[in-house]
A protein has these predicted regions:
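Conserved alpha/beta-domain cores
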Residues: 1-190
């Protein structure tokens, strides 16, 4: 389960998103402690692209800080890194996780994430390489999953909205590249 601060949430005034991040920080520990709840839960924050980077990182910090203010970070907490366009963004996400761990005195490797594949650049780089394989490598043990974003990826490929689905050939291609990139790494596909 991911509580969405990205496309589904939209752009809100900072004070409103701050309040919502605080509410999510209060909700997640109880949700993850519930034996009938999800085994993984967290947030999808705004991307690391320049227009949304500051807001996304602030939301991530507020959620992590808020949960830690109430107690230990719950097992099963996970964040989704959306709209990744380059290996550099994954490297930056690793640095963000390391800094949050340092600031909050958490053991190295505590914070984990999934990479949401919803841009064409994440599948095929300008040099013809499968960028997603480099993303997995850059994340190291922090990346536990790749998540395919059907609608954004299909739109980026020029697929009409009425034709966007997991069954479209562009989705088949992207998912096949993701599967090959993740093979043998322990990174799961979702």
């Amino acid at each position: 389960l991911r509580l969405d601060f990205e496309d589904g949430y939209g752009n809100r005034p900072d004070d409103e998103e701050d309040r919502d991040a605080a509410q999510v920080a209060a909700l997640l520990p109880a949700l993850l402690a519930d034996p009938h709840g999800p085994f993984l839960a967290g947030i999808r924050f705004k991307s690391l692209e320049r227009p949304t980077r500051r807001r996304g990182l602030r939301t991530l910090d507020l959620v992590v800080s808020g949960m830690l203010a109430a107690g230990p970070l719950p097992a099963g907490f996970l964040v989704t890194l959306p709209k990744v366009t380059s290996v550099d963004q994954v490297t930056a996400m690793v640095a963000v996780c390391q800094e949050l761990e340092r600031v909050h005195d958490l053991p190295d490797g505590t914070l984990r994430f999934e990479i949401q594949i919803e841009t064409t650049q994440a599948i095929l780089g300008a040099g013809g390489t499968a960028t997603v394989a480099g993303m997995i490598g850059a994340a190291g043990s922090r990346c536990i999953a790749l998540h395919y974003g059907t609608f954004d990826y299909s739109a980026a490929c020029g697929v009409a909205a009425s034709q966007q689905s997991l069954a479209h050939p562009v989705a088949d291609h992207a998912k096949a590249v993701m599967q090959v990139a993740a093979a043998g790494t322990g990174v799961r596909l979702s």
